[in-house]
């Protein structure tokens, strides 16, 4: 998914799940970086679209049909089709990348607490889906509770303060990093501070403020992952008050 797309604010600021759809033929796949070079310019007009890209709007019609079918499928699904184990794997991959790049840098970060938080989230995701598979599907409120937890999970990854270099980006896992990273993908806030730290190595500038920001955001990241895992815990409904 294009992390800097026009819809990025939905998940990076508001924690709202999004889906990205596009059409690429064989030619456009080879030119994927310039498939629509006039996008977001003054030449991005409906007339140019008809003249050069989709004269009969056939592609737009097909994509709209796919989108409509997706909406129908979501509406008909008993549970939101979110696999939290995929999210757990993403966190594991980001941690692994961080472990590799931070291992050779004198950062003083205790990576074991992040490892523990990621493992805790993985266990919580597995337990959540296990409960989901054994749920009484005749209980509409039980289904509602599970779907609410699935839908609101993204918001558990929001930090009200935002990323260290961009307070408007609140999602500490999926927000795009500010700086172009020349390393493997890591957590966005960590990536930004890591790149700043590397850029200043060997320079006369004092690195302690950068290191302090890195440590502060790192511990906030760990705390947020723990809270996200807690949000997947079983929700016990209040007992009904017996009538007299």
Predicted features, each with a name:
Residues 1-244:
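Secretory-pathway/membrane protein signature
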């Amino acid at each position: 998914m294009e992390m800097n797309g026009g819809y990025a604010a939905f998940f990076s600021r508001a924690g709202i799940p999004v889906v990205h759809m596009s059409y690429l033929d064989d030619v456009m796949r080879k030119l994927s970086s310039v498939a629509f070079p006039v996008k977001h310019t003054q030449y991005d007009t409906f007339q140019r679209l008809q003249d050069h890209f989709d004269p009969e709007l056939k592609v737009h019609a097909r994509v709209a049909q796919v989108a409509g079918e997706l909406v129908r499928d979501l509406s008909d699904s008993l549970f939101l089709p979110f696999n939290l184990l995929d999210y757990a794997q993403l966190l594991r991959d980001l941690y692994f990348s961080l472990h590799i790049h931070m291992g050779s840098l004198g950062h003083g970060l205790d990576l074991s607490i992040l490892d523990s938080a990621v493992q805790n989230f993985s266990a919580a995701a597995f337990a959540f889906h296990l409960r989901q598979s054994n749920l009484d599907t005749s209980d509409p409120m039980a289904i509602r509770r599970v779907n609410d937890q699935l839908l609101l999970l993204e918001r558990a990854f929001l930090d009200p303060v935002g990323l260290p270099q961009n307070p408007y980006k609140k999602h500490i896992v999926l927000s795009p990093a500010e700086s172009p990273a020349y390393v493997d993908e890591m957590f966005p806030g960590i990536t930004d501070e890591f790149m700043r730290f590397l850029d200043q190595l060997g320079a006369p500038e004092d690195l302690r403020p950068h290191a302090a920001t890195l440590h502060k955001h790192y511990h906030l990241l760990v705390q947020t992952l723990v809270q996200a895992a807690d949000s997947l815990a079983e929700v016990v409904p209040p007992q009904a008050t017996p009538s007299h």
